[in-house]
Regions:
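Bacterial N-terminal signal peptides that target proteins for export
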Residues: 1-9
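C-terminal subregion of chymotrypsin/trypsin-like serine protease catalytic domains
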Residues: 31-39, 52-103, 107, 198-214, ...
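Short beta-strand segments that buttress and anchor functional surface loops
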Residues: 40-45, 226-227
């Protein structure tokens, strides 16, 4: 489920200790076949035990862009495995604790290592430390793959300052963003008889701009409309997934899914902006 970090800020990571993880694309979503380079990122501790899962994007054959709180080694992340199947965890069986088709979350299925699945023991966190310095949380991360993955297309980094000016220019509130990830699709109250639902498949949804310069964004975060009224939003497990500038066919990543303000995945969503020169420099340095 989402981890409550303060009274109101909630990270969109899916913890391994829960039978049903907590963050996925919600609301008006569709299956995402447009972005084959978006993967399900599974993290393990020093003992090789599954601790949580996120989403991420290949921006080169070996470099996966995700959130800093996902690749936070200070919180126990040591290694990772990334699955690029659209239905990476669709056949997950709680009784056995794995998906017999993909091997999620324990292994790469035979014949998929280096094609649809890869391992990593090289994780980087831009500086995320439990939201210290908010709103500049430094919530960007990288997973460097042991096996290069060939894709017909990769995620594209933005020009520095790509979002600058959108908050003040006329007509920009209708700017479209597309989110993609493997998180929860429905999140209910913990006391509800209706369970949270996680398909563990790659979904995407579109939304529009809310704010870039509020006290919660201040030039570091991107706030978009959440679930409802023909919109889609993010939830637990979507952390680190791409926020694309434009309609679903866009490959330009301007932010990574970072946090929300509601434990039921309602309300607005926040992504950590990567169109800032210092963030781009850090990404390109690895």
């Amino acid at each position: 489920m989402r981890k409550l970090l303060t009274v109101s800020i909630i990270v969109l990571v899916a913890l391994a200790v829960l039978a049903v993880p907590a963050f996925a694309i919600t609301g008006n979503w569709v299956k995402d076949y447009e972005h084959p380079y978006v993967g399900l990122v599974v993290y393990y501790d020093a003992n090789g035990e599954f601790i949580w899962r996120c989403s991420g994007s290949l921006i080169s054959p070996t470099k996966v862009l995700t959130a800093g709180h996902c690749s936070d080694t200070a919180e126990g992340a040591v290694t990772a495995r990334v699955y690029f199947q659209q239905d990476a965890g669709a056949n997950y069986d709680p009784a056995t604790g794995l998906d017999p088709v993909s091997g999620y979350p324990e292994a790469c299925a035979p014949g998929t290592l280096g094609t649809l699945c890869a391992t990593s023991d090289e994780l980087y966190n831009y500086g995320f430390a439990n939201f210290a310095g908010f709103p500049n949380t430094h919530d960007a991360g990288l997973v460097i793959l042991d096996q290069p993955i060939s894709m017909p297309v990769y995620g594209v980094l933005p020009e520095a300052g790509a979002l600058d000016g959108l908050d003040t220019a006329r007509g920009t509130k209708d700017t479209i963003f597309t989110v993609s990830g493997y998180g929860l699709s429905y999140r209910t109250n913990a006391n509800s008889a209706v369970p949270s639902i996680s398909y563990r498949i790659r979904l995407m949804a579109t939304s529009t701009l809310v704010n870039l310069t509020s006290k919660n964004t201040d030039g570091f975060n991107l706030q978009t409309q959440g679930n409802g009224d023909d919109r889609g939003g993010t939830c637990s497990g979507d952390s680190g997934g791409p926020v694309f500038l434009g309609a679903p066919k866009s490959n330009t990543i301007v932010a990574v899914t970072s946090f929300g303000m509601n434990s039921l995945c309602r309300g607005t969503d926040y992504g950590y902006r990567i169109d800032r020169q210092e963030v781009l420099d850090w990404i390109n340095s690895h």
